[in-house]
A protein has these predicted regions:
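A short helix->beta-strand "capping" segment at the edge of beta-propeller domains
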Residues: 2-23
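WD40/WD-repeat beta-propeller blade N-cap
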Residues: 18-25, 61-68, 104-110, 144-150, ...
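Beta-strand-rich domains and repeat architectures in extracellular enzymes and scaffolds
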Residues: 18-44
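Residue-level detector of Asp-centered blade-edge/turn motifs that repeat once per structural unit
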Residues: 32-33, 75-76, 117-118, 156-158, ...
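Short coil/turn segments within WD40 beta-propeller repeats
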Residues: 43-47, 86-90, 108, 128-131, ...
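Short loop/turn segments that connect beta-strands within beta-propeller blades
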Residues: 51-53, 94-97, 134-138, 174-177
Length: 201
């Protein structure tokens, strides 16, 4: 049947590639429009793999003293940020892994990072406070102390940041420095997810 043409199957899983990093993988994500897959391990190692083949592109060891805690990749996929037990956040280039800027948040662990959907802001949670920096590392906003350690952060829309801690979820307007809403809950909140429109927690 000469009219049959080969095609690339879509909409189903196919065997791809596997790879191993130096320690327990704690964070990962796609960069450079799917051309690169970055994995971070608990010891502070970072590994960039070629998206199609799994071939290692670059790797870095001991990026954070005491270990890596979080990683987030910018929506445009050109830069990423990592944090660790050393109280520092590193903003790095995805192409080669080189550090562009280091933010020093003090002695506390920096446990959560999240770029805003438009990529203009980076939210950083350390202990009971949340800070927001722009993409070149300038501080734009900082919260007051939460009642307990911040357990999760996410952006609900362009300028609104949601945080979770013991007993509540809070929505902050970071541009106008005000609290939009507090949702009280009797108990420990260890994670948080919002619906795509930001209306459901």
């Amino acid at each position: 049947m000469p009219d049959i043409k080969a095609f690339s199957p879509r909409g189903m899983f196919h065997e791809g590639w596997t790879a191993e990093v130096s320690d327990y993988a704690i964070a990962c994500g796609w960069a450079l429009k799917g051309k690169q897959f970055i994995v971070g391990d608990v010891a502070g190692g970072l590994f960039a793999f070629e998206g199609d083949t799994g071939k290692i592109i670059w790797k870095k060891e001991n990026t954070h003293s005491g270990g890596l805690l979080a990683m987030t990749i910018h929506p445009e996929g050109e830069i990423y940020a990592t944090s660790g037990q050393d109280g520092k956040v590193q903003i790095c280039n995805c192409h080669d892994g080189k550090v562009i800027k280091t933010l020093d948040l003090g002695k506390g662990w920096v446990e959560h990072l999240k770029w805003s959907n438009d990529g203009l802001f980076l939210a950083i949670a350390s202990s009971k406070k949340v800070s927001v920096f722009n993409e070149v590392g300038e501080k734009k906003w900082i919260s007051e102390d939460h009642p307990s350690t911040v357990s999760a952060i996410t952006w609900s829309n362009k300028n609104e940041l949601a945080t979770a801690c013991y007993g509540r979820v809070t929505f902050f307007d970071i541009l106008n420095n005000k609290t939009n809403q507090k949702l009280e809950w009797q108990g420990s909140l260890v994670s948080m997810e919002l619906s795509p429109d930001g209306d459901i927690v």
